[in-house]
Amino acid sequence: MISVAYAADAAHAAAHGAFYTEPHFWVDVAFILVVALAFKPVSRAIAAALDARSAKIKSRLDEAHKLREEAQEMLATYQRKQRDAMKEAEEIIAHAKAEAERLAKQAAKDLEVSMKRREQMAMDRIAQAEAQAVREVQNLAVDVAIGAAQKVIGESLSAAQTGSLVDNAIKDLPGKLH
């Protein structure tokens, strides 16, 4: 079979001439030359495009990495600020509680002092009222005694006796006033 195919190709070659006279041959040669000549610049262009794309991707990755680091730093900063704010808030609350306790104790002391002062004022008023009541009772007793004495003296003493009693009372008055 090979011999039959070879013979057919040989007959075909003899009828058409040598292989380099065939247009298919020259198309194939031209294609191979174009591909061979274009391969180096095209491969360089493709390599350059791939390198540029690779550099661009690397740049974006570096930028993304940098942004991620910045975001982590910002997160850490905000977390630190939040912790500081929470600590400060706790300190403020503790201070406010201590201040409230101090104010409550002070208010209790002030209330106690005020109550004692009011109690003392009430006791003073009671003592004044008592003293005034005693004076009024004494004055009333003196008035009653004077009235009774006048009545008794007026009924039992004569005018001469009354005059001598008044004179004696006036003489004794400076000694009794001191």
From Swiss-Prot:
* Cellular component GO terms, alphabetical: plasma membrane; proton-transporting ATP synthase complex
Keywords assigned: ATP synthesis, Cell inner membrane, Cell membrane, CF(0), Hydrogen ion transport, Ion transport, Membrane, Transmembrane, Transmembrane helix, Transport
Localization of this protein? Cell inner membrane
> What highest taxon heads this organism's lineage?
Bacteria
Q: Identify the Pfam families for this entry.
A: ATP-synt_B
Bilayer-crossing regions: 29-50
Can you name one GO molecular function term for this protein? proton-transporting ATPase activity, rotational mechanism
Q: Could you give the subunit structure recorded for this chain?
A: F-type ATPases have 2 components, F(1) - the catalytic core - and F(0) - the membrane proton channel. F(1) has five subunits: alpha(3), beta(3), gamma(1), delta(1), epsilon(1). F(0) has three main subunits: a(1), b(2) and c(10-14). The alpha and beta chains form an alternating ring which encloses part of the gamma chain. F(1) is attached to F(0) by a central stalk formed by the gamma and epsilon chains, while a peripheral stalk is formed by the delta and b chains.
Checking HAMAP family in the record gives: ATP_synth_b_bprime
Q: What is the recorded name of this protein? A: ATP synthase subunit b
Native organism is: Paramagnetospirillum magneticum (strain ATCC 700264 / AMB-1)
Q: What is the lineage of its organism?
A: Bacteria, Pseudomonadati, Pseudomonadota, Alphaproteobacteria, Rhodospirillales
What is the gene called? atpF
